[in-house]
Amino acid sequence: MRGLARAGLLALLVVSLTLTLLTGAEIARQPLLRPVIARTADEITAATDRMMAREATPDRIATRLTALLADQPHNWIALQAVRDVATERGLTLPAPVQTAYDAAWETDSGYIAQAGSCLTCVWDAGTCSLSQALICQAPVSLTPIGDVAGIARAGVAYAAGTEIDEIDLALSIVGLSATALVVVSGGSSTTVKLGAGLAKLARKMNLLSPRLIAMITDSLRAGVNLASLPTVRSTDDLALVVKADALAPLALLSTDLGRMNDALGPTQSLHLLRYIDDGTDARLMANAAEALKSRTLGRIEILGKSRLLRATLRWSDEVYALFAGFAGLIASLSSLIASLAHSFATRTLRRLA
C-alpha cells in the first residue's frame, strides 16, 4: 500500500515537473508571452482605488499640501490635484491648511494678474510656467507649424559649423515624418504629431528630464544623417536622410505622449512629463492617463511615480501557471521525501526491535 502511495507521489512529481518545464519553455519561446503585462483600464482604476483607500488619509493629504505650499514658486497643478483628492474622498482639510491654501492662491493669482504675466501666457504658453497658465486660464495649444523651421535652422547651423539644437531637430523630424513613422510606432500620424509637439513645448518650458533628453538625443544621432540636412527641401528629401527603424523609440515615445495629451489635455500632460524618463515610463503613464483621466495627477501626488506605474502592470496568466507548477512540484517532492523518511524510520525501528 505504501509502495502504491509512493508511486502515486512520484507520478505527481513527474507531472508537476513536466508542466512547470513546459510553461517555462513556452514563456521563453514566445516573445509575446511576457511575465508582466499591462492591466486593462478597469484593472488600473480598481488597483489605484485600493491603493488610495489605504494611502489617501486625511493626515497624508494635509502633509502633502503643506509640503507643496512650502515650495516656491507654488505648483498649482499639483496643489489643485491634491485638493481634488480630498474633495473626491469627502475629506475636510484642517483649518490651518485650508487657510494657507486660500491665502497662497489669493496672493499668487493677484500678483500674476497684476504683473501682466497673463498677457505673455495667452500670447505664448511656452514663455510661462504651468501654474501661470492655470491661473491665467491661458490656452496651451500644440502645433507642428514650427517643424519645418526647426529642420531648416538645424541645416543652416550644420553648414555653418555652429551648435545644433538636437532636441528641437529630433522632435521636428518626428512631427514632419509622422505618417512614415506610424508604421513603427503603431499609432496614428495625428497622435505622433501631438506627442512631438507636446515634447517640444515641454522642452521650451524646461520640463523634460535629463534622461529623456538623453534618449531623444541618442535617437537623433542614430536615426538622422546630419550631413545631409542642408539639402532637405521637402518631406520627400527628409525621408532620404532619416532611418525610420532607428527613430522607432522616439516615434513610440511621441505616440504615448500623444495618447496622454488626448486623455488629459496639454496642461496636465505637461505636468506629468517631469515624471517621464524613458519610453517605458511614457507608455505606462499614458495607460494610467487613459484609465484615470484627470484623477491621474492626484494619484501620482499621493502614491508617487513608482507605485502608480506599478499599478498599471500585473503578472501574466503564464506566470501564475508557472508558480502553480512550482508549488505542485515542491508539494509533491516534500510528500515523497516525507514518505521515504517515514518508511526508512519504520524499517530502522523494526530492526532495532
Q: For each of these PLM feature ranges, what is it?
A:
Residues T23-T48, L194-L198:
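Alpha-helical transmembrane signal-anchor/signal-peptide segments
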Residues R34-A103:
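Alpha-helical protein-protein interaction scaffolds
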Residues R6-G24:
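Hydrophobic membrane-insertion alpha-helices, especially the h-region
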Residues R2-A5, A103, I112-T162, A170-V174, ...:
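Compositionally biased, low-complexity segments of secreted and virulence-associated proteins
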Residues S16-T18, L79, S332, S339:
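Small-residue hotspots
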Residues T18-L21, P35-R39, W105-Y111, S177:
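Short, mixed-charge, low-aromatic patches
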